[in-house]
Amino acid sequence: GIVGHVKGSSTAVGREAGFRAGLGEAGTQAAEIVFCDSDSDKAYEQTKDLLKKYPSMDLIVGLNEYSAVGAARAVKALGKTDQIRMGSIDSSMEQIQYLEAGIYEALVVQKPFNMGYLSVETAVDVTRGRKTETSIDSGSELITKENMYTQENQKLLFPVTK
């Protein structure tokens, strides 16, 4: 199952397409997608409903923090953490705790420093009349329980701010 955030948003559309493509043929057969409007309580209820409708479901992905957290809370509340493999996009403290506990198998974590840097760099290029790309990939990292404490991944999961 897929728990998305805002139906029709470019991030929801792109993330769903990428998830399905990554699964190949199995992705075309994924149960269904629900949208929680970035409300973790709604995602919780929707995930419980999905699991009632599809009792043999064994994979759920949350396409943003709120959808993923609500889905994980539901899976945990229903005692199905051993039955259902979960993945998530983003990296709130609650998501990191679920990864550490083995509820999520992986987090896809964005690189916010790159986002900011490349945004400013592109804005400067535009003001100087330079041709720029219409889409810029700032990168992401697949974080698992096994690699979450490497030095580079710690910087993504636990950024030091002033």
Residue ranges and their predicted role:
Residues F19, D37-Y98:
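Hydrophobic alpha-helical
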